[in-house]
């Protein structure tokens, strides 16, 4: 039977499959056509993410059904020098005691009108 796989870019891929094929097999066929590794693929049908070990019949996927392909997001750690820079950028600030505006580290007066450009500033509290 024939099914369609729609990507986020709007491209539609046509696959020739059997209802007894597993989701793993479908992902392998997508890899053959598009070059996307199966571990980065997520297939969605009827609002549900399809699990690798199950078959197309388990999800009641019939001929000319459309699956949606999205890519798995990968997280990662930040390099230590970039982490220090991010921490400095996010934590080295002054806070107005009247209106709680965040200001640059060397600020003397608040930039907001609602507190009358107050000079009552404090350093931003450090995250523990």
From Swiss-Prot:
This is Ubiquitin-ribosomal protein eL40 fusion protein. In the N-terminal section; belongs to the ubiquitin family. In the C-terminal section; belongs to the eukaryotic ribosomal protein eL40 family. It comes from the Eukaryota. CDD domains: Ubl_ubiquitin (cd01803). There is a cross-link at residue 76 (Glycyl lysine isopeptide (Gly-Lys) (interchain with K-? in acceptor proteins)). Gene3D superfamilies: 4.10.1060.50, Phosphatidylinositol 3-kinase Catalytic Subunit, Chain A, domain 1. GO terms for cellular component: cytoplasm; nucleus; ribonucleoprotein complex; ribosome. Residues 1-76 form the Ubiquitin-like domain. GO terms for biological process: translation. One of its GO terms (molecular function) is structural constituent of ribosome. It comes from Brassica rapa subsp. pekinensis (Chinese cabbage). The lineage of its organism: Eukaryota, Viridiplantae, Streptophyta, Embryophyta, Tracheophyta. Keywords: Cytoplasm, Isopeptide bond, Nucleus, Ribonucleoprotein, Ribosomal protein. PROSITE patterns: UBIQUITIN_1, UBIQUITIN_2. Ubiquitin is generally synthesized as a polyubiquitin precursor with tandem head to tail repeats. Often, there are one to three additional amino acids after the last repeat, removed in the mature protein. Alternatively, ubiquitin extension protein is synthesized as a single copy of ubiquitin fused to a ribosomal protein (either eL40 or eS31) or to an ubiquitin-related protein (either RUB1 or RUB2). Following translation, extension protein is cleaved from ubiquitin. InterPro entries: Ribosomal_eL40_dom, Ribosomal_eL40_sf, Ribosomal_zn-bd, Ubiquitin-like_dom, Ubiquitin-like_domsf, Ubiquitin_CS, Ubiquitin_dom, Ubiquitin_ubiquitin-like.
């Amino acid at each position: 039977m024939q099914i369609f796989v729609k990507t986020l870019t709007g491209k539609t891929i046509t696959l020739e499959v059997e209802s007894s094929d597993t989701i793993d097999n479908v992902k392998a066929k997508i890899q053959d056509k598009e070059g996307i590794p199966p571990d980065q693929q997520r297939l969605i049908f009827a609002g549900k993410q399809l699990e690798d070990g199950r078959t197309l019949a388990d999800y009641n996927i019939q001929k000319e059904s459309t699956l949606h392909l999205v890519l798995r997001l990968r997280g990662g750690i930040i390099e230590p020098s970039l982490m220090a820079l991010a921490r400095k950028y996010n934590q080295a600030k002054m806070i107005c005691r009247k209106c709680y505006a965040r200001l640059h580290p060397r600020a003397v007066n608040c930039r907001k009108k609602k507190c009358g450009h107050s000079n009552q500033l404090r350093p931003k509290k450090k995250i523990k």
